[in-house]
């Protein structure tokens, strides 16, 4: 008996790897895995979401999908979940995603039976789709979308297999201007000629049609020149992706003043604030919300009327160093001149030389919308008298040359303290708490302390680890998400190796005694009744990526064990990440990141609090529970 039992045990051990018992599915590095943030809403393999709101992606022309990804990222189409997911991604990665979904040739489900319609309405819809209406100058849909209505290469999508509600929403979006495209925006012009009855007729008829067996887009055919533009197949299409002309980590020649300035503009991430979503680079107009109202960034292009084309290098130095415009107006510190005042005159002149090379864009500067008395120059003068002194910073004499260079970058053009240093009631930085963490102004993200080990401190990191994180946004110790992903994407990845190492050296040397004590770790298990509920939520929503023990997948999905975003005293970043998902930045050294889907539509406040509390107490994590109030406040705009 014992011999038989022993043989069974030996056999079971031998077969265990083959049986796969107790093992998690093997991780597959594929585009299907990299686009899980997409399929979460658009269905497995992009077959379409279950509610009719998220359309099918599979099999659509790649150029069309690419255009739509750009439109969402750049504000021509409006859906905050999509915009947030796509902001850290490059054009080339968006094209790769589009090509992946375009290559999926999957069967369509049968059409949903049409309700609340009449034969006359369906006949009108068929006429508009197949023949158009010459009197209204409405071309037939088939002229562009193909005789089979399955789309036309390279840019025109198919119209079949789409829910009626989705078709109505898109036509309505074009009519109201909520949906736009690159010019020529043919659909906006055509949709404007459709009345409500025509929109309903078209959507009813299209939604009732069966998708043909060959659902692939067809090659382009001759367009009806009497009703549509000659370049109809290019309507709304964007140029192909191009590579940045300024390579990440390249070091400009010190004698090339404008090239040096272009590098410094990357260090300061000037583009990030002085460009609106989808707007011309450096043309300004981006609104920066503050507790006192909204400040709009200025036009930095070479236009003489609305930009800085008529400025001198002395005018620019005055703005950077003293916070005064060319006309002597005092500037609002939403423009971080309290940090830029540390910039050297040579670097200011180089930055100005670069800005003068930017093509002129005539775009008037938008007036600020600040409340009284904050909108007055007198109030600003009082603020400056209290909190601003122009002048270069004097780093500690005990710092190495590398650390001194790092201090110049971190506290000057890099203006890290703008987010990471707490502010007082009047919006001034509190020097005694420099870089010790703060809620970002008018946002629900928390900029962690760069000194506290429990938050964003790097005292136990090597300088190489810090430099690599600034270059890629990815580390075994954590990833860049939220606003920091934008900083890595547009700024720190472009720094030279020497400058990143200098910043790392200074940040490691900045683990000075902290004026406020670090918050306690909380508890691992207080016996909350919701612990099992949290484990169930983790099983349902998180385990497939982050693993049964929160171990994650190196290079793809971060470990949750010991993750500071999970365990830091302020839980806001954890809550925001679960709510909105996101990608790590697509950098030159990490160009194809993996993403996390948003769960804002899947989890209510109680569920999200329960899940967050579980993450903060499971495995070896120790942090205080998250309450429903924490989640509710994180969902709301300040």
Question: What role is predicted for each listed range?
Answer:
Residues 533-576:
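C-terminal structural cap/anchor segments
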Residues 18-22:
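Sec/Tat signal peptide C-region and signal peptidase I cleavage site
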Residues 51, 295-302, 445-450:
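Acidic/histidine-rich, surface-exposed loop or edge segments in extracytoplasmic proteins
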Residues 23-35, 44-47, 80-150, 172-257, ...:
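Flexible coil segments in periplasmic/lumen-exposed cytochrome c-class electron-transfer proteins
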Residues 59-62, 68, 161-163, 170, ...:
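Extracellular/lumenal glycan-associated surfaces
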Residues 28-59, 64, 68-71, 78, ...:
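N-terminal Sec/ER secretory leader and immediately downstream segment
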Residues 7-17:
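Bacterial N-terminal signal peptides
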Residues 463, 561-606:
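Extended, polar beta-sheet/loop recognition surfaces of beta-rich domains
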